[in-house]
Amino acid sequence: MKLLLRNSKPKIRIKYRKLGKEKAWGIAHSDGLIEIDPSVKSKKHLEIVIHEVLHILFPEASEAEIENKSITLTKILWAEHYRRIEPEVHQPLQDGTK
């Protein structure tokens, strides 16, 4: 599965590949590519997606800042019962995009 966020700068793309050799759950690249290990599931998946997106949106932020913000956002969204469900019903976002 590939996810494209078009209104972000740079365009953020998420791809899944095994990251065992890198000893990472996720990697953010400066060109907007995020790689996530497909073994990451559930709440940890949410945390890693948020964490890597924050790295791209705020490249000047320290690892500690990114970690703190991603954990906070994950806890809030999880408490609000955000869950990844496939297939997804596409309802437009506030800007009209899917």
Spans of features found by a protein language model:
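Active-site recognition of the HExxH zinc-binding catalytic motif
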Residues: E47-I56
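Metalloprotease/metallohydrolase-associated module, dominated by Zn2+-dependent proteases
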Residues: M1-K44, P59-K98
